[in-house]
From Swiss-Prot:
Alphabetical list of Pfam families matching this protein: PE
Subunit structure as annotated in this protein's UniProt entry: Interacts with host Toll-like receptor 2 (TLR2).
Species assigned in the record: Mycobacterium tuberculosis (strain ATCC 25618 / H37Rv)
Record family assignment: Belongs to the mycobacterial PE family. PGRS subfamily.
GO BP term, example: symbiont-mediated suppression of host phagosome maturation
Identification of the protein by name: PE-PGRS family protein PE_PGRS62
Residue span(s) of domain PE: 4-94
General function of this protein: Supports mycobacterial virulence via inhibition of phagosome maturation and host inducible nitric oxide synthase (iNOS) expression. May promote the survival within macrophages by disturbing the cytokines profiles and blocking the endoplasmic reticulum (ER) stress-mediated apoptosis. May also affect bacterial cell wall composition. Expression in Mycobacterium smegmatis, a nonpathogenic species naturally deficient in PE_PGRS genes, results in enhanced resistance to various in vitro stresses. It also leads to phagosome maturation arrest and increased survival in macrophages.
Keywords assigned: Cell wall, Secreted, Virulence
Database matches in Gene3D superfamilies: HP0062-like domain
SUPFAM superfamilies recorded: PE/PPE dimer-like
Coiled coil segments of this chain: none
GO cellular component annotations of the record: extracellular region
Use in biotech settings: Exhibits vaccine potential. Immunogenicity is demonstrated in BALB/c mice. Interaction with TLR2 induces activation of human dendritic cells (DCs). Immunization with this protein induces a significant number of CD8+ T cells and a strong Th1-type response, with high gamma interferon (IFN-gamma) and low interleukin-4 responses, and activation of the bactericidal activity of macrophages. Identified T-cell epitopes may contribute to immunity against tuberculosis if included in a vaccine.
Length: 504
């Protein structure tokens, strides 16, 4: 077996030397161009005309060969630079990375748009109109769900109040007769109320929440400081890829750098494994680690506070309203992830459902539009560059004209996918697989992208024997992903409506 060892710095240095050689060649060509173009005009006799044509032909051939050599040299230097960047990227990947490379959702600019400049604008209008129609259709099917549920709850409360008043009127004589006893019982209950105990409990709970806040902030700051060197290295790699014209890879590494800073891993200790015959069922509740997970933990404190005070209230309409308010806070701040997978090893059939809390979906939607737009800009830049290198100047102009449309289409209607691997230990004995690998292909969606399922690749890394049919890519059921507009207009109001809906 043969191995090739490459030092990226040496490759980059070689590329620099070749670039210097290219500069020398260009200077020589320019120097030669002066004497061949600066000659006096030939005389009108036949001999002078023949000599002039001979030298003119050689001059044209010299310029043609020089241009071809310059183009070849430029492409060769670019290849070396990209090779150095690729080796650096490989070294970074071998050092261990949490998230995979970002796959561009729409990497290629259509050839038709390049041939007919401005075609991308028509596609932008068509995509935007389609997504707006989908957004309106989903909203009109269930308009203002949260507001309608609030109104429905008020109707229930008024019905309860009316029933209580009707009962009081119907039993008014008995209530009057029992009034002295009821007042005496209320006074006794008030005198027996242990105010000091509840005050102590409230103070203790507030101290606990304050400690949780301080500890979590400290962990987040520590994680950011620890991840800063890796961020700098990955940003340097992205910048180098940008310099050599590999714009999509630069955008991908920029996203990976920021993601690795905010999310350092997953806590997969909360796993439930079940087997029945050849079917393996796995229920995992991974928790985010890193600054983003710490931020989500801090976001849950108000909901915990609200739940604590709600629990102190006696059963009443006021408590029901307080519980609904608590449920709203919990829904908006719950960062939980739950993955439920079922695989039949014999038939390689299975299902996967993944449920994400609103903060996670909102985070992806917030970052989605800018990132998808940036990726579209990178794709247009590469298209322009490739067209120029190929001498297709019309195509370069067309791609330049269409670039703003592609950028806006990415911001509104496109998606860029980020691979998120999660390794879940099974704890199963050999020869069963010790680990289930779930690589979620999570999208960064444009603002108007309608709800859609995500996909995932299932594998069994470390299995004693290869399992036929794996790795395999499946459609993930559960929480859909979408752009910011359908998320805020439809999805979140629907989730809040479910949160305050009375139990059947």
């Amino acid at each position: 077996m043969s191995f090739v060892v490459t030092v990226p710095e040496a490759v980059a240095a070689a590329a620099g030397d070749l670039a210097a050689i290219g500069s020398t060649l260009r200077e020589a060509t320019a120097a030669a161009a002066g004497p061949t173009t600066g000659l006096a005009a030939a005389a009108a006799d036949d001999v002078s005309i023949a000599v002039s044509q001979l030298f003119g032909r050689y001059g044209q051939e010299f310029q043609t060969v020089s241009n071809q050599l310059a183009a070849f040299h430029t492409e060769f230097v670019r290849t070396l630079n990209r090779g150095a960047a690729a080796y650096l990227n490989t070294e970074s990947a071998n050092g261990g990375q949490l998230f995979g490379q970002i796959e561009a959702g729409q990497r290629a600019v259509s050839a038709a748009a390049a041939a007919a400049p401005g075609g991308a604008y028509g596609q932008l209008v068509a995509n935007t109109a389609t997504n707006l129609e989908s957004l309106y259709g989903a909203w009109s099917a269930n308009p203002f769900p949260f507001l309608r549920q609030i109104i429905a709850n008020q109707q229930v409360y008024w019905q309860q109040i009316a029933a209580a008043l009707a009962n009081a009127v119907q039993n008014f004589p008995a209530l009057v007769a029992n009034l002295p006893a009821a007042i005496d019982a209320a006074v006794q209950q008030f005198l027996a109320f242990n105010a000091a105990y509840y005050i102590q409990q409230i103070i203790s709970s507030q101290i606990g929440f304050a400690q949780l806040f301080a500890t979590t902030v400290g962990q987040g700051v520590t994680s950011v400081i620890a991840g800063w060197p890796n961020l700098a290295a990955e940003l340097q790699l992205a910048f180098q890829q940008l310099l050599v014209g590999d714009y999509n890879a630069a955008v991908a590494n920029l996203g990976k750098a920021m993601t690795n800073l905010l999310v350092t891993g997953f806590d997969t200790s909360d796993v439930t494994i079940g087997t029945m015959g050849t079917t393996i069922s796995v229920t995992a509740k991974p928790k985010l680690l890193g600054p983003l997970g710490d931020l989500f933990t801090i976001m849950t404190i108000p909901a915990q506070e609200a739940q604590y005070f709600t629990n102190l209230m006696p059963p009443s309409i006021l408590r029901d309203m307080s519980q609904n308010f608590t449920n709203v806070l919990t829904t908006l701040s719950n960062p939980n992830i739950q993955a439920v997978a079922s695989f039949d090893i014999a038939t390689t059939a299975g299902t996967l459902s993944t449920f994400f809390g609103v903060p996670l979906v909102l985070t992806y939607a917030t970052l989605g539009a800018p990132f998808a737009s940036l990726n579209a800009i990178a794709t247009s830049a590469e298209t322009i560059e490739q067209a120029l290198l190929a001498g297709n100047y019309l195509g370069a102009v067309g791609a330049l004209i269409d670039a703003p449309a592609h950028a806006l289409d990415g911001f509104l209607n496109s998606a860029t996918v980020l691979d998120t691997p999660i390794l879940v230990p099974t704890g199963l004995p050999s020869p069963l697989p010790p680990t289930v690998g779930i690589t979620l292909h999570l999208p960064f969606d444009g603002i108007l992208v309608p709800p859609h399922p995500v996909t995932a690749t299932i594998s069994f890394p470390g299995a004693p024997v290869p399992i036929p049919g794996f790795p395999t890519t499946v459609t993930v059921f559960g929480t859909p992903f979408m752009g910011m507009a359908p998320l805020l207009i439809n999805y979140i109001p629907q989730q809040l409506a479910l949160a305050i809906k009375p139990a059947a």
